[in-house]
Amino acid sequence: MKERHVDTLIIGSGYAGVNAYYTLKGRGLIISKNKNFIFWTAKLRNIVSRNLKFAAPLPFVEERTVIDLDLQSKIIQTEQEKIYANNLIIAPGCERQNYDKVIKEAMSRSTISLGTVSHFDEYLLLQLGFYLRRLGKDVKVNTSYLSWLGSDVENQVRQLVSRAGLGYTEKPELIIDECTSVHPFTFYTPSRFLELYRNVYVAGDIIKGWPKLGELAMRTGIYVGGRILNKRMEEFKPTFIFILDGGFGEGLHIRSTKPWGGDYVSVKRSRIRPLLKRFIERYYVLRRGKMGFLINL
């Protein structure tokens, strides 16, 4: 079997992996099963905007499937070779096995009831519900109205749900599976510096116990890239940031540190938020996943 030695190896071409790569200014090898960047926010929006692009090619990614790994030694085995790294970033993401199936089934029905296995995925449930309501469907959701992000968020979400005409159900028929890791990876619990072992970093949805959220994943990728460049020595401070589009002109811009035991909560409602989301949907595909100046939003 061939062997290769690299300075920095990034596993995964999703939100976290590509932003780590961009932060390192391309000075790293990135491998993934997929050479395309998929912006899932735009893909979900595609159910109401059929011509919206949600994917972009990533020519700098080497298509590889990881079959084994020794994290402490920073050795990765693919189907073609063994790769030895000085710095290793684990960012393979996770998979919601039935997500596409739930959307397809919901699109085929006129009356829909939705739920999730994990409360952390309620933001996806609500966004899907708002878009289905926009299509004129009768939609009911099983939700806490994002109460785990703070009472201010819950109150605003309840109002948005009411205005959009979404109902509530205790017995949802279509349930979005929890995101699961893919062999040979598992969910990891890194330090507050997102380090698992010396020079082995974890980024994105593969972090155990965190919400599986694209904006958050991008920030972790930027952070670990900065750590390798010795530019970011402070600990990573996660924040849940999401724009919830109500489907009929109004939206919420949500920020909260509640999932990590913090007390910061901000929720802003306006007609500008959905327009900002439309910009973001196009920006990330055009920029091939690079967060860029949007890190300041």
Task: Report the location of each language-model feature.
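FAD-binding core/adjacent interface of flavoenzyme oxidoreductases
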Residues: M1-L9, P59-H119
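Beta1-alpha1 glycine-rich phosphate/pyrophosphate-binding loop at the start
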Residues: K2-F60, T116-D152
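Short hydrophobic core segments
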Residues: I11, I83-C94, P172-S181, V200
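C-terminal, flexible cofactor-proximal segment of oxidoreductases
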Residues: A16, G225-L297
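Glycine-rich active-site loop/strand segments that organize a redox cofactor
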Residues: K35, L44-K53, C94-A106, G262-S270
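A Rossmann-like FAD-binding core segment of flavoenzymes
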Residues: V61-D68, S73-I76, I83, R134-S191
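Predominantly flavin-linked oxidoreductase catalytic cores and closely associated redox partners
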Residues: I90-A91, E95-E170
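FAD-site-proximal beta/loop scaffold in flavoenzymes
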Residues: Y99-T111, I176-I222, G226
